Structures are given as structure tokens and as C-alpha cells.
Amino acid sequence: REAGLDHILTSFPSIDKKENDYIMQSNNSLEKIMRGIKACVRNGIRISANMVILRANMDKIYDTGKLAASLGCDKFFITRAVPPSYSETSKSDNSTEDLYNLTHEETKKCLDEVLRIKKDFKMRVGSLVSYPLCFLEDLDKYRDFVGRGCPSQSGHRMSINANGDLHVCVHEEESYGNVFKTSIQEVYQNEMRTWHNKSKRYSGCKGCEYIEMCESGCQMISAAVNGETATKDPLYVGPNNVKKDFNLVDDKGIYDVIKKNEKFKVRNTLRFRQEKGFILVNIRWGNTISV
């Protein structure tokens, strides 16, 4: 806290002790997670819990979220599992034997459980890995899972390994350079451009009005399932399958302030980064937009 840390994201795989140990590959992991959360709360540090959903723990979402809320977590993320490249993932969209890829119906049930957590415990919810918007269909109901898109394709992300290797997505094996040998700017502007020039989008998404926000779901999951990026996300349904659009918050008070020519104050934590042809603006936490 004294160093300026104001937020921590922790993994919280399951309320079940044995299951939690198996997923984390660590003994007494649940107790350690709970102890860490309590320490953060005591010291005034915001903490969010992230539950990666597998077929093994999907039935414990509500109880795990309930525990996270009782411990003082600010937000509960339900995140799609990204299969490792060495795993034997199923090529079927609706396989019941696949550990990582849930069926469309199972995934919707998981999202509904998270919305129940939000309602019952007044807890903010979300996801760290995007869902294809054509799969969500009702963007107003599932608004908490809309808008993240793919930070890697948006140019908002770069991952640096402990050894200095540079990746775009945290789930990616390919290295584009090394921070100890190459300029970060050079790697970002040149080597990583294939992620930023729309070539990672699935061709079946062409013409969809939500493609700029969706970016064809998660291309690392697509790569794990199909063997390469720019392919179909397992939850893909089809372009323009959104049945209910996302409704923007219309705050009349903001328009009144504008009409009165009143001054706006910009947060001193706002950050800008000049790129080629655009500027990235980090509003707060992980919220970054291009202008």
C-alpha cells in the first residue's frame, strides 16, 4: 500500500478445497487465497477475484462468488479457459468431453450464475477473456461482458516475460523479441502489427456491425481449438446475430453541464501514449481507448 498499489487481481478457482488445490497445483491454496484477500481488505487495497471456468468447477460459480463477496472482494470475474497449445482440445463446438470448451448452453448458464451473484451480493462482475457478441445475443442483459473485445487486437496490450521475451497476449507462446535486446517501441510498431491490422479477425465475421467491438472473440482460444488464429471462436454463432443491442447510459446531467459551458476536470491519473496515426488514452485501470 505504501508503494502506491491500489488494486490486486487474484485467482479464485473454486470454493472446493481439493479442486482448488488441483487447479492451482498448490497445497492449501484456498486458505492462502482467503488470507491474501483479507490482508488486502485490511490495508485498503481493492481486490478482484478471477474464476477461470472449466467443466470441473462450473457448478460452483455461485458459491465461489458468494465467498469472494463475503471476504470483501470488489469484483468477481468469470473467465473463459484458454487451452494450452499442448492440450488435446476438441474440434467440436459442443463437445461434452472437452475440459476447457463448454457448450453454448453451459456457458450461458455460467454467465447467468454470475449475474445472480451481481444481484444477490451487489458485486461488480465481468470477464478477462471476451465472448463473441453474436453468442451473447442479448447485449443489454449481458452488458457486463460486453466492450472488452480483444485488447491484443486493439493494440492495448504487450506482455513481458520474466526473461524479457515479448508477447502480445499473455496466452501466446510466440515471442516477438526480447526487452534486453530489442526496443519495445520497435517490436510494438513492427513485429506485433499483425495483431493490430485486423488480420486476426475470422472471415465469417465480415459485415457484422459489432466487429470493431468484438474482434471475433478470443483468437487464442480459436488457435488452441483450430490450430491457428483468424479462425472461428468455439462460441461463434454468426454475423449480426445480436437480438438486443447494448444500451448506452444516457446521463442528462452531463448534457446540462455541456449546455451551461461549465468546465470539465480531467483526472490527474489519465495517461496518453502517442502511436502512429492515433493516440491511446488510459482512462483508469484496464480501460484504454484509441483516439
Name every feature range the model reports, one short phrase each.
Residues E2-H7, S11-Q153, R157-N163, H167-H171, ...:
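Radical SAM enzyme [4Fe-4S]-AdoMet core and its adjacent flexible, acidic
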Residues K141, D165-L166, V170-F278, I283:
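Flexible mid-to-C-terminal extensions adjoining Fe-S/redox cofactors in radical SAM and related proteins
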Residues R284-V291:
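Long, charge-rich, low-complexity alpha-helical segments
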